């Protein structure tokens, strides 16, 4: 079982300088506590201050020796050759510790960078295929979404296969399964829904991949985590989650104009699926707490054993809800004490 974490949220009252300083220190602490991967995301929001993920990854990879560092890149917002140069350089200089993670993005991403949001799925899939194939054959395009001359991008890859993953709903799950690529499952869906997503992936996986290959596809799951002997203190993450949800809604606009965006069914689904009909932050937070390892070690172990049922052995955790830097690190330490109770279903 592998464990990673994700950071860079700006809590109310903290400056960007404080967030960035803490972000770097928690990256170093993650390696010291034997976490596997440290993830970064970018959304033009308070919950993703690391605007240039490749630069932030370079900083953390340079400060560590074992920690893997990964992105949640919005692929359509930059030229694939530019992004491929960045990922190849990080792959070489870190000796294979970089993970090229991909997300679809929100309205602000596309409006600021001048990309049509309705075409984002097709562009994401095209750019991802182009970049991953290009690490072996050189970069070329069929001209459907972008035009440029064929080019060899340097340096060559350090790893034979650069680690990659993508956040997924049903259409993306099918696309990833057809290619034998790993998906990232959300922290805001139930265990039964995660199992259903895995079953969908497995149902469409017959694309020339062996059973052994599919068995070892490294899917990951995201969770909010707060482990404390004092169950009441752990429940205090509700205030943090309330602020997070509010910034999420403000950033994505998923409850208004995104609902009318052609080809963006995922955002439409978020309104009904994520909120489950709830219209206030408190009820959304209650819903989230019930799905995630928040509470005493015993409660967290119970929730984590449900995770085993999905067959996923790569877990990404959000610890920032625990408060100060010291409290975050304390909860990270307590989690690593709980972690052995997670079995490896493989």
From Swiss-Prot:
Key word Transport present: no
TM stretches of this protein: none
InterPro entries to which the protein is assigned, alphabetical: Bact_Lucif_Oxidored (IPR050766), Bacterial_luciferase_CS (IPR018235), Luciferase-like_dom (IPR011251), Luciferase-like_sf (IPR036661), Luciferase_bac/NFP (IPR002103)
Reaction equations catalysed: a long-chain fatty aldehyde + FMNH2 + O2 = a long-chain fatty acid + hnu + FMN + H2O + 2 H(+)
PROSITE patterns: BACTERIAL_LUCIFERASE (PS00494)
GO molecular function annotation: alkanal monooxygenase (FMN-linked) activity
A cellular component annotation (GO) from this entry: cytosol
GO BP terms in the entry: bioluminescence
Key words of the record: Flavoprotein, FMN, Luminescence, Monooxygenase, Oxidoreductase, Photoprotein
Assembly and binders: Heterodimer of an alpha and a beta chain.
PANTHER family cross-referenced by the UniProt entry: BLR5498 PROTEIN, LUCIFERASE-LIKE MONOOXYGENASE
Protein name: Alkanal monooxygenase alpha chain
Native species: Photobacterium phosphoreum
């Amino acid at each position: 079982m592998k464990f990673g974490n994700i950071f860079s949220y700006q809590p109310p009252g903290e400056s960007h300088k404080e967030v960035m300083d803490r972000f770097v220190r928690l990256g170093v602490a993650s390696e010291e506590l034997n976490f596997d991967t440290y993830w970064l995301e970018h959304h033009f929001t308070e919950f993703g201050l690391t605007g240039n993920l490749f630069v932030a990854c370079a900083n953390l990879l340079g400060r560590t020796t074992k920690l893997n560092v990964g992105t949640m890149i919005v692929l359509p917002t930059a030229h694939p050759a530019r992004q491929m140069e960045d990922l190849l350089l990080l792959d070489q200089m870190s000796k294979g510790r970089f993970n090229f993670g991909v997300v679809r993005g929100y309205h602000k991403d596309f409006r600021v960078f001048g990309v049509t949001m309705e075409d984002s799925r097709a562009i994401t899939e095209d750019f991802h295929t182009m970049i991953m194939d290009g690490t072996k054959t050189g970069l070329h395009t069929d001209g459907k979404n972008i035009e440029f001359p064929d080019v060899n991008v340097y340096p060559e890859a350090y790893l034979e296969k650069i680690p990659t993953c993508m956040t997924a709903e049903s259409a993306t799950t099918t696309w990833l399964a057809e290619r034998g690529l790993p998906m990232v499952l959300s922290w805001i869906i139930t265990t039964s829904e995660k199992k259903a997503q895995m079953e969908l992936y497995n149902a469409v996986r017959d694309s020339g991949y062996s059973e052994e290959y599919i068995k070892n596809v490294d899917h990951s799951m995201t969770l909010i985590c707060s482990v404390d002997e004092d169950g009441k203190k752990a429940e205090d993450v509700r205030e943090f989650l309330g602020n997070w949800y509010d910034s999420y809604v403000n950033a994505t606009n998923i409850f208004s104009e995104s609902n009318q965006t052609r080809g963006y069914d995922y955002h439409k689904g978020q309104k009904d699926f994520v909120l489950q009909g709830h219209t206030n932050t408190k009820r959304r937070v209650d819903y989230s707490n019930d799905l995630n390892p928040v509470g005493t070690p015993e409660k967290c172990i119970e929730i984590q054993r449900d995770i085993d049922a999905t067959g996923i052995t790569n877990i990404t955790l959000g610890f920032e809800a625990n408060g100060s830097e010291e409290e975050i690190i304390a909860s990270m330490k307590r989690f690593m004490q709980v972690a052995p109770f997670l079995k490896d279903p493989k």
